[in-house]
Amino acid sequence: MDPMRRRAVTIITAAIVLLALPATAGAVTDAERADAGAAYIAAQQRPNGSVPAFSPIGSTSDAVLAFVAAGGQRSAIRDALRFLRAQVRKGHASTVGLRAKVVQAVVAAGRDARSFGGENLVRAIRSRIRDDGHIGRSAVFDHALAMLALEAAGLRPSRAVAGWLLDAQCPVGGWSYDAPYDAGADNRSCFDGSKDDFFTADTNTTAYAVMALEHGARGAYATNPFAFFRDARDATHGGWEYSPGFGTDTNSTALVIQAYASADRSTPSGGRVALRALQPDIACGGWAYSYEGDTPGPANVGATIAAVPAVLRLAFPLVPGGGSGAPRTSRGC
């Protein structure tokens, strides 16, 4: 269905669809939360198929993962892949990180990442692997994404590739977004004290690293990353912070829950409750990014994209048919 027409149908049918949902928030299941979130995302999709949040290509790729996790939204997936295919063909997805995002989306949607937009995206990532295992000159965050992409495509990263990420871990137990730990310059959180170092160990990069290593690693952590997650917990709202002092946010909470799932560990008590609390209005379906005081903020598409797989405890990489498979009808706020 044309995206504009689908949006119109959303407005007309929203009230009818919502009649099927439980009357109280306590009765809402996680599958229904995911369904409502996926519908909210679909309602934000633009006519060209993109779902822009943090970045058009990356966020659209992540939206496909959310749709697959929830099940359904087939026309939204098709339109998103059309957008991504066009971006690949135009050469706009040429970095390690963007290619990795697209590969995960394409594979999860049941398509061939080795022939997409005129490119073999899997080979393009593999061709960037250096002798030391580093995938190109990418940030630690993008290296972890690339490992997940290779794993999604059915490949097990080499010892060197996994070893590079293991060696990048900060002594505090987490990973920093940009650069690997430098024993000669960094403190335990991978901060060198200079005005040019903007990143310390954070929950988001750490969660992606854990998912990549738990799925296909060869080696062991130098420091337990789950101890890092424990210390990054926000005592006020019960979720996880990006880094100390930021407070609970949906994206960080979602990724940490997925990291626990990837290691087949139970989410710490209250963690999933904290994620659910940031989706205060099931009729809207969207998750807030974070709190405004003690109240969740407005619905945010980027936060909702992150929350949908996590509320179902589905870790990356996703496989085709990761959700229930039943068609859904999109709705908005």
Please tell me what each predicted stretch does.
Residues 28-45:
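Short N-terminal segments immediately surrounding and downstream of signal-peptide cleavage
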Residues 12-21:
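Bacterial N-terminal signal peptides
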Residues 77-84, 115-126, 159:
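Alpha-helical repeat scaffolds
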Residues 23-27:
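Sec/Tat signal peptide C-region and signal peptidase I cleavage site
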Residues 41, 84, 125, 165, ...:
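Buried hydrophobic core positions in alpha-solenoid tandem helical repeats
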Residues 28-32, 50-76, 90-117, 134-161, ...:
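An alpha-helical repeat/solenoid feature that recognizes helix-turn-helix modules
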Residues 2-12:
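Bacterial N-terminal signal peptides that target proteins for export
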Residues 41-56, 80-94, 125, 129:
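Internal amphipathic alpha-helical repeat/solenoid segments
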